[in-house]
A protein has these predicted regions:
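Acidic/polar-rich alpha-helix caps and helix-coil junctions
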Residues: 1-30, 40, 53-173
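Short, cationic low-complexity segments
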Residues: 34-49
Length: 173
């Protein structure tokens, strides 16, 4: 299994690595147990995932798939939840590119000449994740700058823990 939400049919290209689960566990969980080291995650997840706008017809399923809330803190559970998963449900590799990334690339390339096409590409990902589609008059889409900001936010929601956000920051800045 390559754990990338929702994985089924979305991975275009990836790399096989049968020891990934153990490596992730050793790095993030083993060190915590043996040394008492604590790795603090993002404190702004409610803002990143816009949880204040969640409703029965508008809930980003990535949020509950990637994080578990424990009081005021969040546990990142996307790659490995616990030690038993290393044997029972190990990660088998890394995704290098997948369908949502292709939609983001398409949306960015279309924005200047075909805003409706750019919006459709972005909404293809958003609606597949349980969110309502954005409309053409949404403030997030009115300028190139606000559109790029929304694409960046989408990458943050879609690809936590992968290093992709750093590359996007280099690209957009």
């Amino acid at each position: 299994e390559v754990r990338r939400f929702p994985a089924k049919g979305e991975m275009i290209f990836g790399l096989y690595n049968n020891s990934l689960s153990q490596s992730v566990y050793n790095t993030f969980f083993g060190a915590i147990q043996s040394s008492g080291t604590f790795t603090e995650g993002r404190q702004d997840l409610d803002k990143v995932y816009e949880t204040s706008s969640f409703a029965s017809d508008n809930t980003d399923v990535r949020f509950s798939s990637f994080y578990r809330q424990n009081g005021q803190t969040f546990t990142f559970q996307r790659l490995v939840n616990n030690e038993s998963e290393i044997k029972n449900a190990p990660l088998q590799g890394l995704t290098l590119i997948r369908l949502p990334e292709m939609y983001y690339i398409l949306a960015e390339s279309l924005y200047d000449k075909d805003k409706a096409g750019a919006l459709a590409a972005l909404n293809a990902v958003r609606t597949s994740r349980g969110l309502k589609a954005l409309t053409a008059d949404d403030a997030k889409l009115l300028s190139r700058e606000s559109f790029e900001k929304e694409l960046m936010a989408e990458r943050m929601r879609e690809m936590p823990g992968e290093g992709q956000v750093f590359l996007a920051m280099k690209h957009f800045n």
